[in-house]
Amino acid sequence: MRRAVARRCALESRTTMLQYTDYNISTLRPYINWLYFYFAWGLSGKPQEAKDRMRAEAEQMLDSFETRYQTHAAVGLFEANSDGDDILIGDVRLPMLRQQHPTREGEPNLSLADFIRPQASGVTDRIGVFATTVDLALEHDFLTDDYQRMLAQTLADRLAEATAEVLHMEVRRSLWGYAPDENLSVAELLREDFQGIRPAVGYPSMPDTSVNFIIDRLINLKQIGIRLTESGAMKPHASVSGLMFAHPKAHYFELGRIGEDQLRDYAHRRGLPVELIRRFLK
């Protein structure tokens, strides 16, 4: 796998690794999930001929990207434990939310904190914190033509996700190394047939975009060209951030509706006004 550069940084006491990596587009192309690309263009369920035409145009644009752009990734591996619904990373407390909807008998209401060993166990666990993005120029070089702009943006989104896919693979197999013997095809990777998850900020299990401010504190998003808006949204738009869990039973889930009681408790744990948290969760 060809990478332009990987930079390691000086570590805090609770950080086991912090790395910034630039990826070539050619490295990422096999890991693009075209199903989501077709969905973005409203082609899900459409005839294959329409998808093939769209794919051909996209591949042509990707050819032009290869000599002009790169993507960028940051990943930190940290010692961690859970404390109730909070994840403790050194002196950083990362509050999580928990499902509140009724479940079948014997099934728990889940929180991402459940996938980290509790502090009371006396055993230190680990967690990954990551972000990926594209060159800012990629989002600015296609503004004069609406169709080209939309095509470039949807490809940029896919490339940011493909970067996260490749980064997660490297974390599992070597950087963290909890699955050193993993040997999956690209199709199996895209089906997520591996141990561990990487829930992203703004998605169903971690919908609060302001979590990005905590992620920024941990891995310094500016190092890969990401800046945050007042709500924690990322610029460039084609950026992904989140957490990596290695627990063998970790899986994705949707939080669903959050009650007013938990909203207030979560705001208290975040140290932020309830109405501000309510806005972040919209």
What is the meaning of each model-derived region?
Residues 107-282:
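C-terminal accessory domains/tails appended to large, multi-domain proteins
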